[in-house]
Amino acid sequence: MKSGRFIGVMSGTSLDGVDVVLATIDEHRVAQLASLSWPIPVSLKQAVLDICQGQQLTLSQFGQLDTQLGRLFADAVNALLKEQNLQARDIVAIGCHGQTVWHEPTGVAPHTLQIGDNNQIVARTGITVVGDFRRRDIALGGQGAPLVPAFHHALLAHPTERRMVLNIGGIANLSLLIPGQPVGGYDTGPGNMLMDAWIWRQAGKPYDKDAEWARAGKVILPLLQNMLSDPYFSQPAPKSTGREYFNYGWLERHLRHFPGVDPRDVQATLAELTAVTISEQVLLSGGCERLMVCGGGGRNPLLMARLAALLPGTEVTTTDAVGISGDDMEALAFAWLAWRTLAGLPGNLPSVTGASQETVLGAIFPANP
């Protein structure tokens, strides 16, 4: 069974940077050793935003974007190796999620698309890459997401305490770690995505630092109720979503009914939308004693305060409190999934994704010996 140093690479729906994590992984433990966040050039970020919102590209433009992202991921890995004074031979493999540009797990031909050419990463780092993690699950009738609950269960499940892990990235997803029950998990809806999109358009800021804008505004209740009427929120699990659905166009359609509103009030309403949709799903799933938050949303003081207020009797904390960096959780999960793939172990949970069976995930892009 492969064990040793693995690198996880994650570029999430928030597009706030490429997260790269170095960890030692074997069948008994996952020990994080180092991490870094690598910036995404504004031009690349905008290109990804455009394609996620349905803007047409030529095949040439699409191919260039795939190559550019692969090179970006390789640069991020090489920066971490240099920082840690490591060579390619010191790493077993890289687990690279890729950049999701479209996720459509239902319909006549279900599919999901993550780009960032893994061949570029192998060529530029000299390290074996495991990528394309989601499509095998979809081929077996699953949603292809979320995949991280299996990792949450391996690291954070408790024999007696009802726990849930909440990742608030661009999309928010919940892992249900309830003793005596199969692991559950699904996307609750928008996490930071709409808040980030709004402040980017209104103020040119990548995100609302410390919720300053949202805290200066007031929740517009009719707008909140209008957004909460979206059918996704009442759809039963398994379910997953992404930027192709909850994007700036979605927000604009709801704002048409509310002309002339204060931008800060919209920011406050979007924060409340995230908090309310998450807390409703926690309660619908039977509640928990401890809700452990990871992802960028864990640094949003307004979101954390609203979750605590909406979930009385639940201890709302971050995964940092139990020794796992909330910022690095997803990248660490894909390093772990790469280890499972190389070990021939399944990486999905049918109780989460709805797939017909457990399966080994991903494709292996081997480095030259």
Curated annotation (Swiss-Prot):
Listed EC numbers: 2.7.1.170
Annotated pathway: Amino-sugar metabolism; 1,6-anhydro-N-acetylmuramate degradation; Cell wall biogenesis; peptidoglycan recycling
Reaction(s) catalysed by this chain's protein: 1,6-anhydro-N-acetyl-beta-muramate + ATP + H2O = N-acetyl-D-muramate 6-phosphate + ADP + H(+)
Keyword ATP-binding recorded: yes
Any Pfam family hit: AnmK
Root EC class: transferase
Annotated residues for binding of ATP: G12, T13, S14, L15, D16, G17, V18, D19
Keyword terms: ATP-binding, Carbohydrate metabolism, Kinase, Nucleotide-binding, Transferase
Keyword Coiled coil: no
Described function: Catalyzes the specific phosphorylation of 1,6-anhydro-N-acetylmuramic acid (anhMurNAc) with the simultaneous cleavage of the 1,6-anhydro ring, generating MurNAc-6-P. Is required for the utilization of anhMurNAc either imported from the medium or derived from its own cell wall murein, and thus plays a role in cell wall recycling.
Protein name: Anhydro-N-acetylmuramic acid kinase
Organism: Escherichia coli O1:K1 / APEC
